[in-house]
């Protein structure tokens, strides 16, 4: 009944899992979307979950810590995920290969096979930040042909690119 009412009145929900290496900007993105302002963050041990409403879509966003010791726990959050937001620190060239390995580990899990993939190419405001086409190549996205993915340049602290990412999720998910 709830789904029927959602279809009639236009309220849609989407479960989003936001992952990425530690210090990529996941929590900053979550609270910039939720509160519209930058907040002081500390490394996430465990998770944060918030509902972000944008253009009559309720995004239930799960932001899970990215430290290497926590990453094995990520799979416990996969079930029911409709959209993956993978956040990359574009100024961290030393760990882009590590980010690629983790991204492919996530998307190759059978629980995540139906999730659409949004990459926030974050920290675009920093000098020498990798541009979206470079992120696309270094993450091995061009070889992924059977999945719906998109790279959105972003700056979590200013909010640049964040709403565009939500628009992409909304228009590419079968609600």
Swiss-Prot record:
The keyword Transport applies. Keywords: ER-Golgi transport, Golgi apparatus, GTP-binding, Lipoprotein, Myristate, Nucleotide-binding, Protein transport, Transport. It comes from the Eukaryota. Pfam families: Arf. One of its GO terms (cellular component) is early endosome. A lipid is attached at residue 2 (N-myristoyl glycine). InterPro entries: Arf6, P-loop_NTPase, Small_GTP-bd, Small_GTPase_ARF, Small_GTPase_ARF/SAR. Expressed in the head (at protein level). Gene3D superfamilies: P-loop containing nucleotide triphosphate hydrolases. Activation is generally mediated by a guanine exchange factor (GEF), while inactivation through hydrolysis of bound GTP is catalyzed by a GTPase activating protein (GAP). May be activated by Efa6. GO terms for molecular function: enzyme activator activity; GTP binding; GTPase activity. One of its GO terms (biological process) is actin cytoskeleton organization. Its main location: Golgi. GTP binds at residues 20-27, 63-67, 122-125. GTP-binding protein involved in protein trafficking; may modulate vesicle budding and uncoating within the Golgi apparatus. Promotes cell movement and remodeling of the actin cytoskeleton during compound eye morphogenesis. Required for normal ethanol-induced tolerance and preference. Probably after Efa6-mediated activation, counteracts ethanol-induced sedation. Belongs to the small GTPase superfamily. Arf family. This is ADP-ribosylation factor 6. It comes from Drosophila melanogaster.
